[in-house]
Amino acid sequence: MSKIRQLLNKIPWYTDQVHSIFMYLIMGGFTTIINIVTFWLCTYILNWDYRIANTIAFIASVLFAYFSNKKFVFDSYTPTWKDRLREASSFFGFRCLTYIIDILVMILLISYLSVDELWAKIWTNIIVLVLNYVFSKWIIFKVQK
């Protein structure tokens, strides 16, 4: 256990569940920054179509999210290759589901409602962040009994 976690554990209301949410927000924040900065670079610097930029941002942020969530948020231990494969395929499968939601909301906001690309990306990230937490907490990284 890290020294920071030991200090935080001295706070009476700081439970494992609070820690999990706190760490998810921290790692989710980094993941969101990676996603938005990658999207911004691809759309505003490279002048790529927002759908391509969104896909590249998705790939970069999901790779970061898998390893950071596994280690720092859910402290997931998978002893066998079968467990690792199940966990990884579940993670990437649910992230593909939220990517579909992400791209559909982006198309709706940008193409039909004329929302600025960067603002649309920020709003879709909020939706995806909540969905990803729910999927990760209760399905992907659930504690094995």
UniProtKB/Swiss-Prot annotation:
Subcellular location: Cell membrane
Keyword match Transmembrane helix: yes
Highest rank taxon of the organism: Bacteria
Species of the source: Listeria monocytogenes
Role summary: Involved in the decoration of cell wall teichoic acid with galactose and glucose.
GO-annotated cellular components: plasma membrane
This protein's UniProt keywords: Cell membrane, Membrane, Transmembrane, Transmembrane helix, Transport
Transmembrane segments annotated in the record for this chain: 21-41, 45-65, 91-111, 122-142
Name used for this protein in its record: Cell wall teichoic acid glycosylation protein GtcA
Family membership: Belongs to the GtrA family.
Coiled-coil features, chain-numbered ranges: none
PANTHER family assigned: CELL WALL TEICHOIC ACID GLYCOSYLATION PROTEIN GTCA, PROPHAGE BACTOPRENOL-LINKED GLUCOSE TRANSLOCASE HOMOLOG
Membrane topology listed for this record: Multi-pass membrane protein
Listed InterPro entries: GtrA_CellWall_Glycosyl, GtrA_DPMS_TM
Pfam families for the chain: GtrA_DPMS_TM
BP GO annotations: polysaccharide biosynthetic process
Keyword Ribosomal protein annotated: no
